[in-house]
Swiss-Prot record:
This is Putative BTB/POZ domain-containing protein L674. It comes from Acanthamoeba polyphaga mimivirus (APMV). Gene3D superfamilies: Potassium Channel Kv1.1, Chain A (3.30.710.10). Residues 83-150 form the BTB domain. Belongs to the mimivirus BTB/WD family.
Length: 488
């Protein structure tokens, strides 16, 4: 008799379909056992996607924790969870672990304190907000991969999102200009590589391999060679020889190859070689080149990639230093300080850098007039924060047109004595800001890529906003020390 009832088919109708299980599968759950001893089918207020998880749990295919998102419904099935709270947001019931919701959102922490007699089921009080937008908030808080737009930021502020102490740093480099340290030029972000060439052929040439690729570019090429083994830089220069030629030119001979001198080698990491090739010095037109690289066979190559940069907007520059005092929280303590990049671009009327002052410094008259009448020809280089030691900063957010393009921690730095030359070539002239309070000097960590030896720059055209997120609400002041780079 027991075998017969164990094989009984039990049907569960959802709002958009149905499931069938045997009595043997559901009999350990008292709710379903008591029902299916009497009837053969029931209806539940769940859709098929949601009930699929319940069926898998009853079949012992997944753990109970997977059902937490549906805890409010499945508790009617006798599937209980400890430390779970329920909220009604815009007509949809959300289930959370109490520790999660109180540690991530100040709103729910206060909600639970204000209604101690209702817990754990707070659904009798409607939170009159969009449940779709709240779902977006949850998705962001759980993975923090999607960009923060203006609507999402409003929702995060409403619910009092408490960011992780371990901030996930990132930078979207497509928005930034950049400069290679040691060079007198920077690259406009509009002319950064639109493609990466990774496909190449390999020809056996005795004790060397010749790597060949076609590259369509006008000027500068950054070549990244990843090695499987490590080698000292001094030994590397004799093992790699490079040759760039126009398409359809004759096969290069030994005399056409150049050794990898320190001029072309930008950087050598443990297993990575960064090479810069300035094609514009030879040809200066926008065509296809044949790239040939002879590499000794005792160098095991993992991959080679070519980053092609249009040379049309490689710009020379002059540095112009400036500073600004930011006072915040005059009326009440705040935990975010918002600074628009536009406000850092000083005007002639309130700056010592007047037309005559700039001309007296030896700056070209055309450059001075471009500055006075057209300030969008500026990027900001080496933005530094002088912050009193009692103020703790969680992280920095950089926004462009309401989209977060960088999240970064601050890095404490030590100033380098300025070079007695003008314009600067690589090393920047940075003068410490004097203060009668103990302060420390910081820079935005993600704006400096140590591997590629690249500095990312903030430009006027980004419509950038700098958001300083404090660990605790406070009021006071800080100073910004920064330099303009006027390009021409």
């Amino acid at each position: 008799m027991s075998d017969n009832i164990d094989s009984k088919i039990c049907t569960v109708y959802t709002t958009d379909g149905h499931f069938q299980m045997t009595y043997q599968t559901i009999k350990e759950n008292d709710f379903f056992k008591n029902i299916f001893e009497i009837v053969d089918s029931i209806c539940v207020r769940m859709n098929s996607v949601e009930f699929e998880y319940v069926a898998q749990y009853l079949r012992k295919e997944i753990p109970k924790d997977i059902l937490i998102n549906f805890a409010y419904v499945v508790k009617n099935f006798g599937i209980d969870f400890e430390n779970i709270v329920y909220f009604n947001i815009g007509g949809k019931i959300f289930s959370f672990e109490k520790d999660f919701v109180t540690k991530k959102f100040k709103y729910f922490e206060r909600f639970i304190v204000n209604y101690p007699g209702l817990g754990p089921d707070y659904t009798s009080i409607l939170i009159d907000k969009s449940y779709n937008k709240f779902q977006q908030v949850l998705d962001f808080v759980k993975n923090q991969k999607c960009p923060i737009n203006n609507d999402l930021e409003i929702e995060l502020e409403y619910y009092g999102w408490i960011p992780n102490k371990n901030i996930k740093e990132f930078i979207d480099v497509s928005h930034f200009n950049f400069i290679h340290e040691g060079y007198e030029s920077f690259v406009n972000h509009l002319d950064q590589p639109k493609y990466v060439v990774s496909k190449h052929s390999v020809i056996n040439d005795g004790d060397k391999n010749i790597y060949q690729a076609n590259i369509h570019t006008m000027g500068h090429v950054i070549i990244v060679v990843c090695l499987k083994n490590n080698i000292k830089k001094v030994d590397l220069l004799s093992k790699i020889h490079v040759c760039f030629q126009k398409e359809n030119e004759k096969v290069p001979g030994e005399e056409n190859y150049r050794s990898l001198t320190n001029y072309y080698l930008l950087r050598k990491n443990k297993h990575q070689i960064i090479i810069r090739e300035a094609l514009s010095s030879q040809y200066g037109d926008f065509i296809t080149y044949n790239f040939n690289m002879k590499i000794s066979k005792d160098l095991e190559i993992d991959s080679i990639k070519f980053y092609c940069i249009n040379n049309g907007n490689i710009r020379d520059y002059y540095d112009i230093p400036n500073k600004k005092i930011i006072e915040y929280g005059k009326d009440e303590s705040i935990d975010k300080i918002n600074i628009k990049l536009h406000d850092l671009i000083f005007s002639v009327e309130n700056s010592k850098f007047s037309c005559n002052y700039l001309l007296n410094r030896g700056i070209n008259k055309k450059i001075v007039m471009d500055y006075i009448f057209k300030k969008d020809g500026y990027v900001i280089d080496y933005l530094l924060f002088e912050i009193p030691t009692e103020i703790e900063v969680s992280h920095i957010e950089l926004k462009s047109r309401d989209e977060i393009i960088c999240v970064s921690k601050l890095e404490e730095i030590t100033l380098v004595p300025p070079l007695n030359r003008y314009p600067n070539t690589g090393s920047r002239k940075i003068v410490p800001v004097l203060s009668n309070r103990p302060t420390k000097l910081y820079r935005i960590n993600k704006l400096y890529n140590k591997k590629l030896n690249v500095n990312f720059l903030l430009s006027h055209e980004m419509f950038c906003e700098i958001v300083i997120v404090l660990k605790e609400p406070s009021s006071g002041w800080l100073k910004l020390k920064y330099q303009y780079m006027n390009y021409y």
